[in-house]
Amino acid sequence: MELSGTVALVTGANRGLGAAYVTALLDAGAAKVYAAARDPRTVATDDPRVVPLALDVTDAAQAQAAAREAGDVALVISNAGISHGTAPLDDDAIEGARAELEVNYFGLLNVARAFAPVLAANGGGALVHMHSVLSWIHFPSSGTYAASKAAAWAATNALRVQLRGQGTQVVGVHVGYVDTDMTARVTDPKSTPEEVVAAVLEGIEAGAEEVLADEVTRTVKAALADDLAQLYPGVQARYDAVVA
């Protein structure tokens, strides 16, 4: 789809990757960007094309209300996400897993269900879901987060089939570490939000159904055809070093 002149909505738009999406869409010539956040007062902007919008993605009724208010949207970017950094056997694993699923999986579904009719009414448009390389490879320290992202990836693939008939481009974005507050304690190499957003917007305009936004993600995706014994030795070694 063409970004110039489009009307877009970005969830989790008040900081990090979401804020970078808003800026890049404006730079690409978007006519309007709904910057959705739990508290729209946290959206910092002086551009009249930006419309702060209250949206807690875990609230299905609020997602439906947002869809009614933003009825001119042709591009929806589901970016809102959280990570509790819990391993499956941690004391707080169930609490962390439920919270992550509420935002990363059920929240994504709430937004997709609310806006699919809006996209259909506006010519099909595009629905973009932010996933992670952890949709495919799983470290204990982020095991519950990875489960939520794997679930979201599965939902995206199903939605792509469901929405193809109405002309909606459904894009799954996979990326490793991005330099945001969520990864503040991570010492591994990170992509900048601007690098990731540029790759995604290029993919949208090219009609892509999947965007692999960094080299780590491309490497892991290529290795998925291998036996697990080939994919996981590095994960095991890293875990063993931590617990030693």
Question: Which role does the model predict for each range below?
Answer:
Residues 7, 14-15:
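Conserved glycine-rich cofactor-binding loop
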Residues 26-44:
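Conserved glycine-rich Rossmann-like NAD(P)H-binding loop of the short-chain dehydrogenase/reductase
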Residues 83-98, 141-144:
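Conserved mid-core segment of classical short-chain dehydrogenase/reductases
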Residues 112, 148:
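Active-site helix of classical SDR
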Residues 132:
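Residue(s) in the substrate-gating loop at a strand-loop-helix junction
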